[in-house]
C-alpha cells in the first residue's frame, strides 16, 4: 500500500515537537507502517526528521518565520491560523506535489484533520482516511479512525443509541508509541509529576491541590498558559524535550492526569505506563479504557479520591511491571496490526468484495490485548 502523509503546517515533523500530539502521531505512523513494507510519502517542513520513502518539502523555515515571527512555542501554546502564510504555502505546495506522485488506490492521510482538508478536497480520487481522530468537530472523510471509544461514542451521539445506523468503517484504533523512547524504571524518586499543557482544562490545579493535601512533592512540566501562576511549593520545569520527559516519567512515583474534559486519548498516560509509572486520572474519557483502576493507577471523582490514590501509591499497591505490561498494548508493533487490518478492509472496498471479503487470519486477532 502507498500512503501520502500530510504534515502539520505550523510544526516540523520531528521528535523535537514532542508537545504536539498530531505531529507525534504522524512521525510514529510513518515509522510504524514503513516497517511493514508500505510506501510512505511525507509532505511537510524542510527540516522534518521522519522515516519514509520520500520526504517532500512543502514549507520552509522562512514560511514559519513569515507566519509566526520569533514566537517561541516552547513557552506558550502553539500559535497558528489556517489563513496564515505557513498554511497557505503548505496548501499550495502540497496540492501540486501530490499531483505529481499519486497513483490509483493510494491513501491520503490528513493527520491534522480539517486543518489540511483543502489539500484533500483537490485529490478526491485518492482514498482519504482521517487517522487518529481526537478532535471534537469538523470530521468529514468517508473513512475515519478514532483514537478511543470515548471520542467515537461522543461523535456518534445519543441519537445512535436508538437508531441502527452505525457505519462499519468508522473504527477505533488507539494511539501508538515507540517503546524505545521511554526508560522503564522500578526504583522511583521521591516526587510526583504533572506533564502537559499547564492550564485549568487539563486539571493542573487539581494536581497541585492533591499533592499539597497528600504532603508529596510535585514537579510540573509543559507549555504554560499566559498569566498562569505556578505556586512556590511546585517545581516548574517548563517545556520538557524528549530526553527530559523520559527522565521525569521514569523517576516519578506516579503522574497526575486530572483532565476536566472528555479526554480523547491522553498519550502522556500511556507514556507513563511504558516508564513503569502509575497514573492518577479523572474517571472519564479514554482514561476509563486505558487506566485500569487498582492495576495501572487510579481513576478519581473527588479530591478525596485523588488524595487516597496518592496514599495507595505510597503504600506500593501499584506494580511497575503491571504498568509496563498493559502499556505495551500501545506499542508500534501491536498497533500496526490494527492499522494493517483497517487499511486492508478499506482497500477491499475498492479492489475486492468489500464487506464480504475474507478476513486475513494473521490480522484477525489485532484487537486482542494483554492484561497484567
For each predicted feature, which ranges?
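Catalytic cores of nucleotide-sugar-dependent glycosyltransferases that transfer UDP/GDP/TDP-activated
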Residues: 1-372
